[in-house]
């Protein structure tokens, strides 16, 4: 079985002769995996894929096998919800609420798309001014700078992300904090061990 360990982005594949190249149709979940065995379209064989982790293949990208063979990636049709709105503001508001729920979201000029979810459809219906339609379509969400949507504990980079978050937290805790009270006065202290100082300070003021 041939192995593809790299790929060419669709924007850079324009000069390639792909007229005889086999294709492989993949869902979004499959396009986000870095290592897997693929069945080529039209029964044209198998391909092992072992590309760099954290990559998401897009419709029109070209996998390159070790022997130079090209395989064209085709995005499968998926069950999605397409959101339209009466105004750009209402569409942006829908995107905001979906983003708060860590939804993988495809953002186009006049619509949004996400994997169909009846609960999210009900949530959008309560916003007003937006329409969500269920359909089969190619789904290519904006995966952002980190290559994915909501990250969980089993994600490959979770350890690094958690360490960074912990470092930021401890740096914040070590910095003096200013507290302001309703009486218009303020004071600075380090950490959160207040002891009896607040009561004495307030009594004097």
Swiss-Prot record:
Region (Disordered) location: 178-205
Statement: the UniProt record of this protein carries the keyword Chaperone: yes
GO terms under biological process: protein folding; protein-containing complex assembly; urea metabolic process
CDD domains (UniProt xref): UreE
Gene3D superfamilies attached to this UniProt entry: Urease metallochaperone UreE, N-terminal domain (2.60.260.20), UreE, C-terminal domain (3.30.70.790)
Superkingdom in the source lineage: Bacteria
Compositional bias annotation for Basic residues: 178-196
Protein name: Urease accessory protein UreE
Lineage: Bacteria, Pseudomonadati, Pseudomonadota, Betaproteobacteria, Burkholderiales
Gene label: ureE
């Amino acid at each position: 079985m041939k192995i593809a360990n790299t790929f060419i982005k669709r924007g850079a594949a324009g000069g390639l002769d792909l007229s005889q190249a086999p294709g492989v149709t993949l869902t979004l979940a499959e396009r986000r995996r870095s290592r897997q065995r693929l069945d080529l379209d039209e029964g044209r064989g198998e391909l092992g894929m072992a590309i760099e982790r954290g990559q998401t293949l897009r419709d029109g990208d070209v996998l390159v096998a070790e022997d130079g063979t090209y395989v064209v990636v085709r995005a499968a049709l998926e069950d999605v919800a397409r959101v339209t709105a009466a105004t750009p503001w209402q569409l942006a508001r829908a995107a905001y609420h979906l983003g708060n729920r860590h939804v993988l979201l495809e953002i186009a000029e006049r619509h949004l798309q996400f994997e169909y979810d009846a609960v999210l459809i009900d949530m959008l219906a309560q916003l007003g001014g937006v329409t969500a339609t269920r359909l089969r379509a190619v789904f290519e969400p904006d995966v952002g700078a980190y290559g994915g949507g909501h990250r969980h504990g089993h994600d490959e980079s979770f350890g690094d992300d958690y360490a960074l978050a912990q470092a930021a937290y401890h740096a914040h805790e070590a910095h003096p904090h200013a507290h302001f009270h309703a009486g218009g006065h303020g004071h600075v202290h380090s950490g959160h061990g207040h002891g009896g100082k607040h009561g004495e300070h307030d009594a004097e003021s």
